[in-house]
Amino acid sequence: MRPRWIKVFHDLWDNKARTLLVVFSIAVGVFSIGVIAGAYQIISNDMSISYAANQPANVELRTVGFNQDVLGSIQNTHGVLDAEARRVFNMRVRVAGTEKWTTLDMVAFEDFEANTVNLLTALQGDVIPKKREVVLERDALNHVDVQVGNVLEFQLQDGSTKTMPVVGVVQDTAMGAGDFLASPYAYVSMSSLQYLRQPELFNRAYVTVETGGDDIRHIRVIGADLKDKLEKNGTRVIRTRFSETYEHPLASTVNAILGILMALGILIVFLSSSLIANTLSALLNQHLRHIGVIKLVGGRRRQIFEMQIGHFKQRSKT
């Protein structure tokens, strides 16, 4: 090995701390950009695909209460592909024999087998509860220490309690998407409402559109038509919610977070470049006398330049 390259490796060894600092700064910057870019591609694509696979509703109508006839009029509205009605109400629940109460949003289905909007994915046990049975959404298990086969106590408005067994666990990626403050969900049949002292009326309508499932303007037009139609028939609409089929409600939030992380990764790369420049400047100042000796014994400018570039390359490879 030529003497000048021996000197390069000797300098690297003598400045181990600076060498490692440069290497780690470059590695962190490149790694962060690679990971964030990969995460962006995976999350942005898979999140939307999995969301769309559950046939999410494009329009959600929250009302004071309606019956099967009103649902039929919604289904027959021009531009509507499908519509389902449910009753949603909240109750305090606890595992039988314990003291801790947890609030759950109860969702009552008319027909679980005919479910075509906001599909439920079975995870454990039965996905179709019978009369006086309940199925929990997966997130509810983080709030209620219960397993399939256990019994839950439900507190009614007058303070009395009713019990129902947990017969299954499902995943619902569509209904609570985008609502950070939503309570965990539990699912019962409409035949259980009288047992829970709830009126056997729907208060939510979930609608999918025939065309333009990714056109939010078209979806809003259909939603406005449905709202006008219901209110003209005497059904007061409290709130409407719109969402596209292939865009998760949290997609913009996730993309914004990933964008911030990407900017931080790029900033790290720029900061590491500044660190490298300062380190090389300090090394050159240390080597002024060495460079003078090299030139004194016949070293050319090109050779000195190659030494410093080689010094930098070795730091980068290390």
Per-region residue spans from a language model:
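Membrane transport/envelope proteins' first extracytoplasmic loop
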Residues: 1, 5-9, 14-270, 315
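Interfacial "coupling" helices/loops that link adjacent transmembrane helices in transporter permeases
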Residues: 13-15, 274-313
